[in-house]
Amino acid sequence: MIELKHVTFGYNKKQMVLQDINITIPDGENVGILGESGCGKSTLASLVLGLFKPAKGEIYLSDNAVLPIFQHPLTSFNPDWTIETSLKEALYYYRGLTDNTAQDQLLLQHLSTFELNAQLLTKLPSEVSGGQLQRFNVMRSLLAQPRVLICDEITSNLDVIAEQNVINILKAQTITNLNHFIVISHDLSVLQRLVNRIIVLKDGMIVDDFAIEELFNVDRHPYTKELVQAFSY
């Protein structure tokens, strides 16, 4: 379970980015955090990851194996390492896998799943496309076998085919390996395909919280309706 109780946070004392956030996420629930840029979505993810401490309130995680997938993959890779080195580091650090043959077999399996060419493993992060690097970014996190996965705008650099491929892979992971799956996004179509619950943030506060089946309910918050209407155009 993940639980946030009366969490408030600001990067300075004069302005709070998040105010009195209360969220409970039971095991097995996939949650989307929806809102415009600057509403506090990424800050909320950083708090759950433990990158920041709340100014007020408490955060409880029943599982410590939490990993993020961020929007900009270039900042997630060592620029001087090949893709292969970065992927194998995850296998060693998170799974204790040192056998090179076993590492190679796992990488080949995942390359096939993500529809990526093995020749790309010898490249530096700067030598592959943004979409390819983002898929490697997702692959590396899944190789680490986290129990909680937090994805922050991970499809922003992907074309529609690669996007659907990654979504299918993540959906399969939520069934087999993940206790919790949190998706930060402004893209409603991505959330509709990945989560079963949506929490809407506006100006650092939760204004709506509902099951995905209730997205078009007449009782939705006016801001949620505004987001839905904007996406439909």
Swiss-Prot record:
MF-aspect GO terms: ABC-type nickel transporter activity; ATP binding; ATP hydrolysis activity
Gene3D superfamilies: P-loop containing nucleotide triphosphate hydrolases
EC number: 7.2.2.11
Predominant cellular place of this UniProt entry's protein: membrane
PROSITE patterns: ABC_TRANSPORTER_2
Keyword Metal-binding tagged: no
Entry keyword Thylakoid: no
Keywords, sorted A to Z: ATP-binding, Cell membrane, Ion transport, Membrane, Nickel, Nickel transport, Nucleotide-binding, Translocase, Transport
Role summary: Part of the ABC transporter complex NikABCDE (Opp2) involved in nickel import. Probably responsible for energy coupling to the transport system.
Family according to the record: Belongs to the ABC transporter superfamily.
Protein name: Nickel import system ATP-binding protein NikE
